[in-house]
């Protein structure tokens, strides 16, 4: 009787392990189908363009170079020289590996990327002071410093009432 229970537990355990592997591979194939559908929707604009035009759509090339393969982002050149790093079903590591050569976000240009280059406008906003009038300390600190002091007071790290900040 004990052997029968033990063999049934082993049978259930092996079935659950194999079913997880099958479900994982099925979910990856479904995810690849969904990704292909998304890429195809962005490529629809290409069909309406002339074939002579060398200019491509802005959205399609940026999305085409990123493909999802075994939970990592690779462009086509890296996909050709990819190596087998072990088991395809790594159940312990579900995170994405870091690949610092690929930048999936767009680089900002001009004053949006570096707001400190705006010069006068930026310095005026940081040097702005609150004008309460009654408090003598209100003109000494910029807004950020006074807000930080108020937060410290509300957290109870300073031994004085909040209205004296």
Curated annotation (Swiss-Prot):
Gene Ontology biological-process entries: cell differentiation; chemical synaptic transmission; feeding behavior; negative regulation of synaptic transmission, dopaminergic; neuropeptide signaling pathway; spermatogenesis
Transmembrane segment boundaries: none
Annotated disulfide bonds: 153-162
UniProtKB keywords: Amidation, Cleavage on pair of basic residues, Developmental protein, Differentiation, Disulfide bond, Hormone, Neuropeptide, Secreted, Signal, Spermatogenesis
Modification Isoleucine amide, positions: 143
Keyword Protein biosynthesis appears in the UniProt entry: no
Post-translational events: Differentially processed in the brain and in peripheral organs producing two neuropeptides; NEI and MCH. A third peptide, NGE, may also be produced. Preferential processing in neurons by prohormone convertase 2 (PC2) generates NEI. MCH is generated in neurons of the lateral hypothalmic area by several prohormone convertases including PC1/3, PC2 and PC5/6.
UniProt GO MF annotations: melanin-concentrating hormone activity; type 1 melanin-concentrating hormone receptor binding
Signal peptide residue numbers: 1-21
Superkingdom per UniProt: Eukaryota
Pfam families: Pro-MCH
Function: MCH may act as a neurotransmitter or neuromodulator in a broad array of neuronal functions directed toward the regulation of goal-directed behavior, such as food intake, and general arousal. May also have a role in spermatocyte differentiation.
Similarity comment: Belongs to the melanin-concentrating hormone family.
Protein name: Pro-MCH
Source species of the chain: Homo sapiens (Human)
Gene of this entry: PMCH
């Amino acid at each position: 009787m004990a052997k029968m229970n033990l063999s049934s537990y082993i049978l259930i355990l092996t079935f659950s392990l194999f079913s997880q592997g099958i479900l994982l591979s099925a979910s990856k194939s479904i995810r690849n189908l969904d990704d292909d559908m998304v890429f195809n929707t962005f490529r629809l604009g290409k069909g309406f363009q002339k074939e002579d035009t060398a200019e491509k759509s802005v959205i399609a090339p940026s999305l085409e170079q990123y493909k999802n393969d075994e939970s990592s982002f690779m462009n086509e050149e890296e996909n050709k020289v990819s190596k087998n790093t072990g088991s395809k079903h790594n159940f312990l590591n579900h995170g994405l590996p870091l690949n610092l050569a690929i930048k999936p976000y767009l680089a900002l240009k001009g004053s949006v990327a570096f707001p400190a280059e705006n010069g006068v406008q930026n310095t005026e906003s940081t040097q702005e002071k609150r004008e309460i009038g009654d408090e003598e300390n209100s003109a000494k600190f910029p807004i950020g410093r006074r807000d930080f002091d108020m937060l410290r007071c509300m957290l109870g790290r300073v031994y004085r009432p909040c209205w004296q900040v």
